[in-house]
Regions:
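Membrane-embedded transmembrane helical bundles of large multi-pass transporters/channels
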Residues: 1-41, 106, 135-391, 525-528, ...
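Loop-to-helix "switch" segment enriched in basic
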Residues: 44
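Membrane-proximal amphipathic alpha-helices
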Residues: 47-48
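Structured non-transmembrane domains adjacent to transmembrane bundles in polytopic membrane proteins
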Residues: 52-71, 81-162, 393-600, 604, ...
């Protein structure tokens, strides 16, 4: 095969320049280490937004047009002894925030008052304030710490901090802690698994060395890219997991094949070249398949999916580069010493050692239909719960209960309607000046129409101050000089627009709230006004609709490119189709298990998490792209080994038995490594 010849010569070239390759990689890795302490700092948003949607454009319009339509910090005050009706309650809140005057950032504080009655709790023992910043305000971790220190404890109250800046800070901090926790669990277990697989100290240590190198290079590369692109705070965890799994898998494939070739090759150079021509070629095409699967994330105009796509592509690229250059160079330097320092008896290539897999493969090949039906029924049964999937968007429930954001949310919902935290925001544009008679009449009509909707709990705007006032009354009211009215107009309106905030009676993401969004978008409006919707419920709804609209294109992309890559590798029309079909079945089975455990809550007591009643839509897409690529990884390695023997014997049955016999142990070992790495993240506090 021409491709094999290329990889054979590539292996010989690596052997000739092995020392140079190792030194170059060592310099790159060492020069990356100083950046590690600050890798998390550029990741500042969840990324759950479609930047091209009407809601995102409306949000950007408000950020440019209103003075304090930027990050918001929420401070919740609760007292068991003082009522909100007592003047002392507001006095203590004011005193608590007094030191904010020394803050060097422009800000605005919205206190609870008669005109802001929604800031008072239903039980009259809680209230919260909103500290708003300008859209271009950079609330770094240091600035947030300064803010928290300036907010003084109230004498008779407990206070809790919330808002998106706190959520992002909590998520970043928890991500760092989770990475350390996962490493503490994964590293010793991975070492044990590698020792059981390779049975020698040197062979077992190489995958750890490559995995650590991959982690360093990947984190620093994403840090650099985050200076150029807005990347989601969830990128690091997912990318790190993908990178480590791929690197360790590729190490297992290459090292095991190298040790096998050492037993039959006349020289180390020839063994390395043969390894590259077989396992190296399989790894290259496997990487292309994973690359194609993850690149489908770029089809979605969602920042979070784009971010994970960037992280995944970086992970695959670095894993491939290390596995196809640094790893062979190290193997060339180590040579026969790869089998030194044996900790367990080494019978790696003894035929009796392969008896189990040969027996199983023989039984399967002689009764293929029976095994196919049994496995198919099993996978379909596992996948059946997926028919009950309830896709949604994750909220603060993914954070641990001890985080500031989660504590704020849990306390908030005891005293307030949770929906007040996530109102729908209507940007109402008028053709004539906002305070003209015609515009005010249109605004009053719109306000009344919204209030009549059965799903609407409350509407706030400049024509909802008093139910007794009509358009004519508001016209005369805003003609009068009044500092409070002027302040209200400055905060909510411009010359040709104003903002309505609307609270739904139903939870964010519910069918009723989504129906409300559609109803408002299709309202029959006065010709003088035009509305745009934004706000968290609208952004989330747009994200869901965007994912549903673009998923068929991503599906075709993944299937088509996977088929083409396998077609080039295997020179068969049927085998790529078979591989894609099996991947689809295993993916459905995985989704079914996810529904059973994480949506419906089975085993949640043992796994120590709170079921959310839904599965995150973006996570389902990420799992599809990543898992399809990963399962293709094993398909490529197994089928390439089967084809290699088929080209020698032209016997289909024997080649299948041979491929399973010589590949299954290393594939199951690689899968075990992936299970260990993924399992270590089960102990993470971010769900």
């Amino acid at each position: 095969m021409q491709e094999s010849a290329y990889f054979f010569r590539f292996g010989e070239a690596i052997y000739r320049h092995k020392m140079t390759i190792v030194i170059v990689w060592l310099i790159i890795i060492l020069s990356s280490l100083p950046f590690l302490p600050q890798v998390v700092s550029p990741f500042k948003s969840t990324g759950l937004v479609n930047d091209h949607s009407i809601s995102a454009k409306a949000d950007n319009f408000l950020k440019k047009s209103l003075p304090f339509y930027g990050p918001k910090l929420l401070v919740l005050y609760k007292s068991s002894t003082i009522s909100t009706k007592n003047p002392l309650f507001l006095a203590e809140i004011t005193a608590s925030l007094k030191k904010l005057e020394s803050l060097d950032l422009p800000y605005k504080i919205t206190y609870p008052s008669r005109s802001n009655a929604y800031l008072y709790g239903q039980n009259h023992h809680a209230a919260y304030v909103i500290i708003s910043f300008k859209a271009d305000a950079h609330l770094s971790d240091e600035k947030l710490i300064e803010l928290k220190n300036l907010i003084q404890p109230a004498q008779h109250m407990k206070l809790f901090l919330g808002g998106e800046p706190v959520f992002i800070q909590n998520t970043n901090q928890q991500t760092q802690q989770d990475l350390v926790k996962a490493d503490m669990i994964a590293i010793p277990v991975t070492i044990l698994v590698l020792l059981l697989i390779f049975k020698t100290l040197i062979a077992s240590s190489i995958p750890l060395l490559l995995g650590g190198s991959c982690a360093v290079l990947m984190l620093v590369t994403l840090f650099v890219l985050a200076q150029c692109f807005s990347l989601s705070i969830y990128t690091l965890n997912i990318a790190l997991l993908l990178g480590l799994c791929l690197t360790l898998d590729y190490c297992l494939f290459l090292i095991s094949r190298f040790r096998e070739e050492l037993t039959t090759s006349a020289s180390i150079k020839h063994a390395l070249a043969m390894t590259q021509a077989s396992a190296g070629k399989a790894i290259f095409f496997s990487g292309l398949a994973v690359f194609a699967s993850l690149s489908a994330l770029f089809i979605f105009p969602i920042n979070m999916l784009f971010s994970v796509g960037v992280g995944g592509i970086v992970a695959v690229s670095i894993a491939l580069l290390l596995s196809l250059t640094l790893l062979p160079a190290l193997l060339g330097l180590i040579g026969l010493r790869i089998n030194h320092f044996s900790l367990l008896p080494v019978h790696l290539f003894n035929l009796r050692h392969l008896h189990f897999w040969r027996t199983m493969a023989t039984k399967v090949t002689y009764r293929p239909l029976s095994f196919f039906v049994v496995v198919l029924i099993f996978l379909l049964c596992l996948g059946y719960p997926f028919t009950r999937v309830n896709p949604g968007i994750s909220d603060l429930g993914v954070l641990p209960k001890h985080s500031n954001s989660r504590q704020f949310f849990d306390e908030f919902q005891h005293s307030f309607a949770v929906n007040t935290l996530t109102p729908l925001t209507l940007v109402v544009h008028t053709r004539k000046p906002l305070l003209s008679r015609a515009s005010l009449k249109s605004l009053v009509q719109l306000n009344q129409s919204l209030k009549r909707h059965p799903f609407v709990l409350k509407v706030n705007n400049i024509v909802a101050l008093n139910q007794a006032l009509n358009a004519k009354d508001y016209y005369h009211l805003y003609k009068q000089p009044d500092k409070h009215l002027n302040k209200l107009l400055k905060q909510t309106s411009g010359r040709y627009f104003t903002v309505f905030t609307l609270i739904s009676r139903f939870p964010m993401g519910s069918a009723q709230t989504n129906a409300l969004i559609e109803d408002i978008r299709h309202m029959q409006l006065d010709s003088n006004v035009r509305i745009e919707l934004t706000g968290t419920p609208v952004n989330n709804y747009d994200v869901m609709q965007t994912i549903k609209a673009y998923f068929p294109y991503a599906l075709v992309w993944v299937m088509l490119f996977s088929y083409v890559i396998l077609l080039i590798l295997l020179r068969s029309l049927f085998l790529p189709f078979k591989a894609i079909l099996m991947n689809a079945l295993s993916l459905c089975a995985s989704y079914g298990v996810l529904v059973l455990i994480f949506q419906e809550g089975h085993l949640h007591q043992w796994l120590h998490f709170e079921p959310q009643g839904m599965l995150d839509m973006s996570l389902l897409i990420i799992i599809f792209c990543a898992l399809f690529g990963f399962s293709m990884d094993y398909e490529v390695f197994l089928l390439s080994r089967i084809r290699e023997y088929y080209l020698q014997t032209k016997d289909n049955t024997l080649s299948v038995i041979y491929g399973i016999e010589h590949s299954s142990k290393i594939i199951t070992s690689a899968a075990m490594i992936v299970i260990v790495l993924c399992g270590s993240f089960m102990f993470a506090d971010v769900l």
